[in-house]
A protein has these predicted regions:
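Sec-dependent N-terminal signal peptides
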Residues: 4-13
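A helix-coil-helix interface module used to build multimeric assemblies
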Residues: 15-187
Length: 187
C-alpha cells in the first residue's frame, strides 16, 4: 500500500509543461511524450528503490539518464521496425545508454498500459491548465462585453421567435456565467 502511494505521489508531482512550453501541441509532441515516459519510469525506479525492490544505484542511473536525448527518434523508429511495439522500442533504445546493469531494472514490474495511461493522464492534466487559462481570458473579455452592453437593447428570443426586449449585456452575462461554470468544472 505504501509503495503504491509513494509511486502515485512521485508521478503526479511531475511537471509536464513549463511556462516556456505552454502549448497544447508541445504537450502531446513526440519528444515531450518520450520525456514523460522517462520521467514516469525514473519515478517508478526511485519508488521501487526506496522500498528495496530494486537497487538504489540502478534507480540513480535510470534517473540520471531520463533525458529524451537518450531516446532519439531515428533510433526508436528503427527499433520499432524490428520489435513493432511502441514502448518496447523506446525502452530498448534507452537501455543501451544505461550503465552497470541498470537496464535490467528499467520498467521493472510495469506494463505498457500502466505507463501510457499515466502519460495520457499527465498530458490531459497539463492541457486542462492551459484550457483553464484560456477560459479565464475569455471570461475577462465577456465581462467587458457585458459591462459595455448593459444598456444595449435587443430582441429577446424564445423557441426560435422574438420575445420581450432584453439587453445584450444580459445575454452576454449568461455566457459569462456558463463560462465560469466550465472553469469550475475543469478545476
Amino acid at each position: 500500500m505504501m509503495k503504491n502511494l509513494l509511486s502515485v505521489l512521485l508521478i503526479f508531482s511531475m511537471s509536464v509543461v513549463t511556462d516556456e512550453t505552454k502549448d497544447i501541441a508541445y504537450i502531446y509532441s513526440y519528444d515531450n511524450t518520450n520525456q514523460i515516459v522517462m520521467n514516469i519510469e525514473a519515478a517508478l525506479a526511485r519508488a521501487q528503490a526506496s522500498q528495496g525492490i530494486i537497487p538504489e544505484w540502478a534507480a540513480e542511473e535510470i534517473t540520471k539518464k531520463a533525458e529524451v536525448r537518450y531516446m532519439p527518434k531515428t533510433e526508436v523508429d528503427a527499433e520499432n521496425e524490428f520489435v513493432r511495439h511502441r514502448l518496447v522500442s523506446r525502452l530498448n533504445v534507452w537501455k543501451r545508454s544505461l550503465d552497470n546493469g541498470a537496464e535490467e531494472y528499467l520498467h521493472y514490474g510495469a506494463t505498457t498500459v500502466d505507463i501510457f495511461d499515466t502519460v495520457l493522464v499527465l498530458q490531459i492534466k497539463a492541457s486542462l491548465g492551459i484550457l483553464i487559462d484560456d477560459l479565464i481570458e475569455i471570461e475577462n473579455l465577456l465581462l467587458k462585453l457585458t459591462k459595455d452592453n448593459i444598456e444595449t437593447y435587443m430582441a429577446g428570443r424564445t423557441i426560435g421567435q422574438h420575445a420581450l426586449p432584453i439587453t445584450f449585456g444580459k445575454k452576454t452575462s449568461t455566457w459569462l456565467a456558463e463560462n465560469r461554470r466550465n472553469i469550475e468544472r475543469l478545476k
